[in-house]
């Protein structure tokens, strides 16, 4: 059920299947929505505290693992079985294909897809906006009063400078 819901998410959002060229004419392309690789770590035979420690260590390692922008995938998925009734789904995505705001939306959609499949039905979700449509909307917004208001807001937010961020690099 989980793999089916995750595959449904990848099918809905082409950006999650994106790859980037090394300098050819085409800068970005989409891989077909096939071949979901959900890694499974079964730590249910361990003490719960040790399983939690392994999860923390594995998540830290996951954060340090770079993405291959050319060959992908730019989204990695794995499931840790901590106890027979407690699991952790770990989703790591490159910021080029999923930012913090869209990640929240994806989790909500995944929940809807999972629950629908669990009930034996189809999820009722609005059509997903393609990256191309999103870029078109941004282009239409250029110069609008809404865009100008947003620009004024962010200039005010960072009038004293933006804080330095420590981000892992690829």
Language-model features: locations:
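Acyl-group handoff/entry surfaces in thioester-processing enzymes
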Residues: 1-32, 46-141, 147-149, 156-170
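Helicase-core coupling region on the C-terminal RecA-like lobe
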Residues: 43
